[in-house]
């Protein structure tokens, strides 16, 4: 069973993603604020973080912060089509993949499965 974190500022989206993950056997924690998510993750390791990417989050380097807590943590960022550049920056900062909004449940499930089955390259 994967342990997952959802960081999204919109309650409805957070709850939708949570429901999908729970239906797929995940343990899930949800947060609306970056600082609370990072603080919780520092003492509660997770396998996957799904982060709704906002411009200010790239500046704060949320992906790097999460990866510093666990190199093996997988990160899926959610972004709107208009913010594709943000997704590219997030990938440069440690995100593993991205998904464009609006969220399609089947695509979300496929991305989550794909990310969690990727192997971490050995150094």
Which residues make up each language-model segment?
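C-terminal output helix
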Residues: 85, 103-112
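Conserved phosphotransfer microenvironments
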Residues: 50-66
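Acidic, metal-coordinating helix/loop segments flanking the phosphotransfer/catalytic sites
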Residues: 5, 30-48, 55
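Short, conserved "switch-loop" micro-motifs in signal-transduction and mechanochemical regulators
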Residues: 81-82, 93
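Two-component/phosphorelay signaling modules centered on CheY-like receiver
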Residues: 10-29
């Amino acid at each position: 069973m994967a342990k997952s974190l959802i960081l999204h500022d919109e309650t409805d989206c957070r709850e939708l993603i949570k429901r999908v993950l729970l239906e797929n056997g995940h343990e899930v924690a949800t947060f609306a604020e970056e600082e609370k998510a990072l603080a919780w993750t520092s003492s509660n390791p997770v396998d996957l973080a799904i982060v709704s990417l906002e411009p200010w989050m790239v500046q704060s380097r949320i992906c790097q912060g999460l990866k510093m807590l666990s190199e093996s943590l997988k990160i899926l960022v959610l972004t709107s089509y208009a913010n594709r550049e943000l997704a590219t920056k997030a990938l440069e900062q440690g995100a593993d993949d991205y998904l464009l909004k609006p969220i399609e449940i089947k695509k979300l499930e496929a991305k989550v499965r794909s990310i969690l089955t990727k192997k971490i390259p050995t150094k």
